[in-house]
Regions:
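Helix-turn-helix
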Residues: 15, 19-57, 61
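Hydrophobic alpha-helical connector segments
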Residues: 61, 75-110, 161, 165-168, ...
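C-terminal peripheral helix-coil segments that are non-catalytic and often amphipathic
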Residues: 91, 95-102, 139-140, 144-152, ...
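Amphipathic alpha-helical segments used for helix-helix packing
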Residues: 104-129
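Short, solvent-exposed amphipathic helices
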Residues: 109-110, 130-137, 144
Length: 217
């Protein structure tokens, strides 16, 4: 396929995904139809099917696109830390939380749609598999971060790193859900900074507190 044709196809695919995000935000997953998405994208009713077999596949593509963009934002934030700070699990955790907050507040439409994924995962097997894959990768990285922090004395000995990763993730999801339910009622950046500052297992002396202050927003 010629390069120009490939670029045009990629652009049209992105156009359809953006239209899907708009429709899912406005009407929800179940009410939205492929015809709605086609209309929002300004294409014929059959065009979305040239790129996606159905609405579920389109939703999954949207989820994966958001997940990749979020991962890139987090990786960039951690990569920008100076070398000494990058070696501190608590500082890295704060950078992760800050990057997630910035991404969510900067992309409220898409993120609001994808909050629905956790509900859809209960009864849509393909969506569930996608969400589980993304969660497993995130939990694995967070577990490793907590393991390093425990070894460095930044969290108490005997702390379960896998459990703390789940608790931290639950805190992030909970804050995002509250922020989307009542936009403007609180600062998501400040709340996530506080979550990272205390850590799922609680603060650990001056090291945890000073790092939280240094990375709060």
């Amino acid at each position: 396929m010629p390069k120009i044709a490939e670029e045009a196809r990629a652009a049209r695919r992105d156009q359809i995904i953006a239209a899907a995000a708009e429709c899912f935000t406005r009407s929800g997953y179940h009410v939205t139809t492929m015809a709605d998405i086609a209309e929002a994208a300004g294409v014929s009713k059959g065009t979305p099917y040239l790129y996606f077999p159905g609405k579920e596949a389109l939703f999954i593509a949207l989820y994966e696109e958001w997940d990749c963009a979020l991962a890139a934002r987090v990786d960039a934030a951690v990569g920008e830390l100076p070398e000494p700070a990058r070696g501190s699990p608590r500082v890295v955790l704060a950078a992760v939380a800050s990057a997630i907050a910035a991404h969510v507040t900067g992309n409220p439409q898409t993120c609001r749609v994808l909050m629905e994924a956790t509900t859809l995962a209960a009864y849509e097997p393909a969506i569930a598999a996608t969400v589980r894959t993304a969660d497993a990768a995130s939990l694995g990285q967070l577990t490793g971060l907590f393991q390093a922090g425990i070894a460095a004395g930044q969290w108490p000995p005997g702390t379960d790193p896998a459990l703390q990763a789940r608790l931290f993730t639950a805190g992030l999801y909970g804050l995002m859900a509250q922020w989307h339910t009542a936009p403007g009622s609180f600062s998501l950046e400040t709340a996530m900074a506080a979550l990272a500052g205390t850590g799922a297992a609680g603060p650990s002396g001056d090291g945890g507190n000073s790092q939280a202050k240094g990375t709060g927003t």
